[in-house]
């Protein structure tokens, strides 16, 4: 009985989707995926619900310290063009019609800029949503970048400065960004802002004799 109902639902759903114009079909698929996500055993995992959205809805964040060298970016483009998108772009909602990129800026740039990909993907890109406060989104971006071994020191120090000014202490910064206390202190010192480390003593390694 259950298998028969499932087969009938699957068949009806397939026929319904096939009858829709393409943009309406994509919208319907997204809505169905979100409905399934609500009852999924894996609904706590962002990748459980990958949606297709217009690339014009995505915008970069203003804090990403990641940088990809031209050869790596060229290889990334070749990989996406040949193998397809194997990783969605991680985003957060900023308003009803816009999403801010948490991770995947270069995938977005390539997907939006490559003529062959624009044609193949019909102006859409795959995204998965990660919600949270600005502090949490910054930390998520840094974790993604550091896990791949890529981040710019100066930009990273700016992130530490902002998180410190938003009320995060050294322990929380280190825990959320995967740094030890010395690394947090050094990144603060790069900015040359005394107030950021006024409550800390200098490490002996930084003492000039």
Swiss-Prot record:
SMART domains: ParB. InterPro entries: ParB/Sulfiredoxin_dom (IPR003115), ParB/Sulfiredoxin_sf (IPR036086). One of its GO terms (biological process) is cellular response to oxygen levels. It comes from the Bacteria. PANTHER family: TRANSCRIPTIONAL REGULATOR, TRANSCRIPTIONAL REGULATOR-RELATED. This is Uncharacterized protein YbdM. It comes from Escherichia coli (strain K12). The gene is ybdM.
């Amino acid at each position: 009985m259950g298998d028969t109902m499932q087969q009938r639902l699957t068949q009806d759903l397939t026929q319904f989707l096939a009858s829709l114009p393409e943009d309406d079909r994509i919208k319907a698929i997204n809505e169905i995926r979100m409905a399934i996500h609500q009852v999924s055993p894996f609904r706590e995992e962002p990748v459980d619900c990958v949606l297709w959205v217009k690339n014009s809805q995505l915008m970069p964040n203003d804090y990403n310290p990641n940088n990809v060298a031209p050869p790596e970016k060229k290889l990334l483009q070749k990989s996406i063009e040949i193998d397809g998108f194997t990783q969605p772009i991680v985003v957060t909602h900023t308003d009803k019609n816009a999403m801010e990129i948490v991770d995947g800026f270069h995938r977005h740039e390539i997907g939006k800029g490559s003529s062959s990909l624009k044609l193949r993907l019909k102006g859409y890109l795959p995204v998965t949503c990660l919600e949270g406060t600005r502090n949490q989104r910054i930390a998520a971006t840094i974790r993604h970048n550091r896990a791949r071994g890529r981040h710019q020191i100066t930009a990273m120090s700016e992130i530490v400065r902002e998180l410190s000014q938003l009320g995060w202490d050294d322990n929380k910064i280190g825990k959320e960004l995967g740094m030890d206390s010395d690394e947090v202190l050094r990144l603060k010192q790069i900015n040359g802002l005394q107030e950021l480390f006024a409550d800390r003593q200098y490490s002996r390694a930084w003492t000039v004799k």
